[in-house]
Amino acid sequence: MEPIVVTENLWKLYHAGKVEVPALRGVNFKVLTGEFVSVMGPSGCGKSSLLYVLGGLAQASRGHVLVDGNDLVNMGDAERTKLRRHKIGFVFQRFNLLPTLDARGNIAIAQHIYGDGFDPHRFEVITKMLGLTDRLKHRPSEMSGGEQQRVAIARAIVNEPKIILADEPTGNLDTQNSEIVLSMLSQLNKELGQTIVMITHNPEAAAYSNRVVHMRDGVIVDGVPAD
């Protein structure tokens, strides 16, 4: 498999007054096409900063970030936004669903805004796989947290992105709903070959991935392939 994500000597610095604080310090990282990789580490170790830089939501300070062969560091804002919309799907701890739209609308709007228009076949495949067929007419306020997160996942993958970046996707969920969401991410990886990078502090969540990478103080300290 070819790598779909590559970072080379990646640095991310934040400014605290006149002081530069490194969140990422020379990170070298690869994700192969079709992998499900979990990034673990204590709070403040840089794992969310890594995900935001990989997704083009934050600018690298130094180094290179290649996503599907495109170096985000050498792109302008418009190019980076275009790549993000067409090649990357995001799943966050907060569901960020539009409260006035039902589940169908929250998913379909991604096809209209970021895709080539509504694709009924793709929509049906994804919503069926995520167990949302009987929830499509429900608004977010009428759904459980787990159901809302499944809608958010459907919205993220409905346009067939090259990679899903998930930042603590089960952080607001109870144990039962966490297991459902993680099982569905694993299913998407195994059945559709969806590449996923997931940030988590939970070893039980990381166990659903193919490989676990550990971070500390802005660097990757190891990466353990799953048995």
What do the PLM-derived regions correspond to, one by one?
Residues 212-224:
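H-loop (His-switch) and adjacent beta-strand-loop-beta switch element
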Residues 3-215:
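ABC family nucleotide-binding domain
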